[in-house]
């Protein structure tokens, strides 16, 4: 006879137990270790500091659970042990973090997962129970983000940053601002308006506690964002290249394509007409070579062939215009760089401006030749108006580098070496990561490697530096290469993600949006294992999942079946 049979009180506690599930598992493990025929349950309860009524209830519940559970006894004992409770807690936390918070899985589907896995015999899978877990985790995610933002900001080194800004609609207005190098979200919140004052307020709240200076804002040409950047932040406005190219596509692509399709239809019509006349001509000649209609038919065939040739030439002209327009549009992206992507040589703002102007001139010429509508020409004019800002962005890039080099107090040869070799090499590396094709990525990486090899020649300046000095200069060169930001694609991509989540959930609350921001900044990792927060603050944050394990409530037990009355 074991000790629990000597317990005099067999009733369950009527009050809700203040004991955590893991603590109960620890006490039951202590009981199993001390249990013997020579010691009573009351004595064991005193030794492990648990009321004897409570201990008896725990033991009886565990034994009933072991008898009624469909899992093997050893598996059930494991899940009832402290380590088993920890495992269940880890599974529930991971499931909610990955399935519910990050990937929009419904709570009923999550309960289904627990049912199919058999874990519903150890954890409560009801909608209400899992809703409580989801709400608690959402609150914890927001709390973690706030605490880590404050903690990491204290030790963050001061620096200048770029912001990419844009709005999206759910249909509520959602303002989004991201630091593009780290991909860290600074602003992501719903607001009733999207004017400059609203942008100023949102950015000021976030930037107030950070040792950063916004020196550049990349976005579309929204007047509110431009005013916010130039007036409130005192930053340079860098136009987003995508919107410039988008205007040129709207102006030329569809119109020229429709003319090509029309020319193709005319050519097919002319070919059918020519073929029909040839059939009549051949049929008439077959009937009689002296047919007086043959000369007339021959003239008709000749005129049809001439018309077909002219139509074919018109089609070639339309196709050539399309190809030239596409090349000009692509040329805007190819040449809008402070470094020549073919040679790796630095380019001045005037050189870049001249190249870009040539592409705009080509598009204007094609519009005139094709007789495009006034609306199309207005679109081209709108895109061309951004040329000055694009050229100014190149000048801003080199001005910022000059200011950095002056602040670092480098010698003239070292400054020249950084400008001509090291900075362009690292810029080409970044351009290679964003190239459209594998062939272009390989070419740019190869060119960057060649320039880096030249810059690191032991016979040059590189050979005169210590290893620490070499690492420091390479870090400085990478910082300089990051100054040029011509695209707000990081924000556009984030807006697309939010649209998909809004479509799945039908509504994104302010709290849910905050939780998603924290997941983006502190959970999503790149291939090197770094998070956006680590790249932005320059220090590793606490592990989000481990923090959730420490703060999220342990999973509740499933409700026991009610006794029949």
Can you say where each PLM-predicted feature lies in the sequence?
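Basic, short loop/linker segments at the boundary and entry of helix-turn-helix/winged-helix-like folds
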Residues: 9-29, 53-100, 128, 158-159
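Charged alpha-helix within mobile-element recombinases
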Residues: 268-303, 316, 320-323, 327-330, ...
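RNase H-like nuclease fold core
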Residues: 79-243, 248-345, 351-359
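Conserved small-residue motifs centered on glycine
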Residues: 340-343, 347-451
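C-terminal domain-tail junction helix/linker
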Residues: 420, 424-435, 439-468, 473-488, ...
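Flexible coil/turn residues that form the inter-helical turn or adjacent wing/linker of helix-turn-helix
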Residues: 36-37, 103
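Short alpha-helical "recognition helix" segments of helix-turn-helix
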Residues: 40-48, 110
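Mobile genetic element proteins and their domesticated derivatives, centered on retroelements
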Residues: 27-30, 55-58, 110, 166, ...
């Amino acid at each position: 006879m074991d000790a629990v049979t000597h317990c005099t009180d067999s009733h369950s506690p009527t009050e809700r137990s203040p004991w955590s599930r893991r603590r109960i598992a620890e006490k039951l493990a202590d009981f199993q270790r001390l249990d013997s025929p020579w010691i009573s349950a009351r004595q064991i309860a005193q030794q492990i500091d648990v009321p004897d009524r409570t201990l008896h209830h725990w033991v009886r519940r565990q034994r009933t659970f072991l008898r009624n559970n469909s899992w093997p006894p050893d598996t059930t004992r494991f899940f009832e042990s402290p380590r088993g409770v920890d495992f269940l807690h880890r599974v529930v936390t991971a499931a909610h973090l990955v399935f519910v918070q990050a990937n929009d899985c419904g709570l009923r589907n999550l309960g289904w997962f627990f049912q199919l896995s058999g874990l519903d015999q150890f954890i409560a899978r009801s909608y209400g129970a899992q809703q409580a877990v989801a709400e608690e985790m959402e609150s914890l995610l927001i709390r973690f983000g706030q605490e880590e933002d404050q903690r990491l900001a204290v030790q963050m080194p001061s620096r200048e940053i770029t912001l990419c800004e844009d709005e999206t609609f759910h249909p509520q207005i959602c303002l989004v601002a991201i630091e593009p190098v780290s991909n860290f979200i600074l602003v992501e919140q719903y607001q009733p308006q999207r004017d400059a004052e609203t942008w100023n307020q949102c950015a000021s709240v976030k930037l107030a506690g950070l040792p950063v200076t916004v020196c550049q804002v990349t976005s579309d040409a929204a007047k509110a964002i431009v005013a916010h950047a130039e007036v409130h932040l005192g930053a340079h406005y860098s136009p987003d290249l995508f919107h410039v190219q988008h205007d040129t596509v709207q102006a030329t692509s569809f119109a020229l394509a429709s003319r090509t399709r029309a020319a193709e239809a005319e050519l097919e019509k002319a070919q059918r007409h020519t073929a029909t006349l040839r059939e009549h001509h051949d049929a008439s000649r077959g009937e009689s070579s002296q047919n007086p209609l043959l000369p007339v038919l021959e003239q008709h065939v000749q005129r049809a062939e001439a018309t077909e040739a002219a139509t074919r030439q018109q089609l070639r002209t339309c196709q050539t215009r399309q190809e030239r327009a596409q090349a000009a549009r692509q040329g805007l992206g190819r040449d809008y760089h402070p470094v020549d992507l073919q040679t790796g040589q630095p380019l001045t703002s005037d050189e870049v401006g001249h190249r870009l102007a040539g592409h705009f001139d080509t598009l204007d010429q094609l519009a005139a030749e094709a007789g495009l509508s006034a609306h199309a020409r207005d679109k081209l004019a709108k895109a061309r108006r951004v040329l000055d800002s694009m050229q100014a962005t190149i000048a801003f890039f080199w001005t910022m580098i000059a200011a950095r080099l002056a602040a670092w107090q480098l010698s003239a040869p070292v400054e020249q070496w950084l400008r001509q070799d090291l900075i362009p090499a690292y810029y080409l590396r970044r351009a290679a990561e964003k190239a459209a094709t594998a062939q272009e990525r390989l070419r740019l990486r190869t060119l960057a490697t060649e320039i880096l090899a030249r810059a690191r020649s032991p016979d040059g300046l590189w050979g005169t530096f210590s290893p620490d000095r070499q690492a420091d200069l390479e870090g400085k060169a990478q910082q300089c290469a990051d100054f040029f930001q011509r695209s707000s694609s990081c924000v556009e991509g984030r807006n697309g993600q939010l649209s998909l989540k809004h479509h799945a959930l039908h509504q994104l609350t302010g709290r849910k949006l905050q939780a998603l921001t924290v997941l983006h900044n502190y959970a999503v990792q790149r291939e090197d294992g770094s998070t956006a927060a680590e790249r932005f603050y320059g220090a590793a944050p606490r592990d989000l999942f481990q923090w959730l394990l420490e703060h999220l409530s342990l999973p509740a037990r499933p409700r026991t079946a009610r006794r029949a009355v």
